[in-house]
Amino acid sequence: MSDIKKIKDEFLLKLKENLDLNQVNQIKTELFGKTGLISSQFKQLGKLAEEERKKFASDLNLVKSELENLITIKIDDIEKKEINKKLEKEKIDITLPERPFVQGKIHPVSQVIDEISSIFSEIGFSVEEGPDVENEYNNFTALNTPDNHPARDMHDTFYLDDTKELLLRTHTSPVQIRTMLNDKPPFKIIAPGRTYRSDSDQTHTPMFHQVEGLHIDKNINMGHLKGCLNYFIKEFFEVDKIKMRFRPSHFPFTEPSAEVDIGYEIKDGKIVIGEGDKWLEVLGCGMVHPNVLKNVKVNPDEFQGYAFGIGIDRLAMLKYGINDLRAFFDCDYRWLNHFGFDPIDVPTNYRGLSR
């Protein structure tokens, strides 16, 4: 018993000292480790007579419990002091003025996509999406693009494997193919999204944005296409009148095909869309080729339709006076702050597309 009391008194004094966490853990090991002082005392129990063993075990357990409690209290106290010390060092001065609130801006491309979607939704179009990585069939073959067409060349298209089965889509027309394969006519959709071509200069980037439109139904003709595009261009540029001309062109997936120019004039160094004696190309369009309809199991004798493709980046440049396409992708906050839009002000036809 004298050994137990001696151990107890010695370590009670030690635990009253100003210790750090490592020192307390070391004391804990000295007492209760495999070869610790208290652990060694328990090993002596087998050598004692029964009565003596009972009393010794009782006294030993009391000392063990007391020392364990003191060690736990000591550790808690040290940890609290360390936390308080850390908090004191990291405390925040709530009297300091707050940092200025910086509100982000909507990128012009995102704004124009929202504007286009809003305009076409007013005349019954729905918005469809598809993957950026496409297969060769949806991107070329189903769209009546022959094997020897220049668009299939490596210098125009980003292929992802040697077989040329997978590629980065060169337009969003594959979304039209996917939609028609998965559903039945009539179809009235637009498909905005990223597209990819191997080109880079002031007016071209390897990745750019397009919106493709498709309307398939019975008795659809070129007049419907002209009316749809006339409505869209007037709404998008927010003008009452628009001067348009359709020039004959060629696209594998439409017949007849046309490129659309709009009239404009220069006033005070700015392009004014609507009237004027100058012309500006804005999009390509045409009546959907019968072969395309056959490829998606739609009877071309029963259903007809039109399609169009518009460069979103180009429209944004024209409408908002942006001269260099590459600036769209430079991640310059100053540029975005100047050309960006209020994220709360969602474009609608009723309140105005851009304010």
Swiss-Prot record:
Give the InterPro entries listed for this entry.
aa-tRNA-synth_II, aa-tRNA-synth_II/BPL/LPL, Phe-tRNA-synth_IIc_asu, Phe-tRNA_ligase_II_N, Phe_tRNA_ligase_alpha1_bac, Phenylalanyl-tRNA_Synthase, tRNA-bd_arm
Q: Which residues bind Mg(2+)?
A: 255
The Gene Ontology biological process annotation of the record reads:
phenylalanyl-tRNA aminoacylation
Database matches in PROSITE patterns: AA_TRNA_LIGASE_II
EC class of the enzyme, as a word? ligase
Give the UniProt entry's GO cellular component terms.
Answer: cytoplasm
Keyword Magnesium in record: yes
- Give the main location: cytoplasm
Q: Which cofactor does it need?
A: Mg(2+)
Give one Pfam hit by family name: Phe_tRNA-synt_N
NCBIfam families recorded for this chain? pheS (TIGR00468)
* Record text on subunit structure and interactions: Tetramer of two alpha and two beta subunits.
Name the UniProt record assigns to this protein:
Phenylalanine--tRNA ligase alpha subunit
Question: What lineage does UniProt assign to this protein's organism?
Answer: Bacteria, Pseudomonadati, Pseudomonadota, Alphaproteobacteria, Candidatus Pelagibacterales
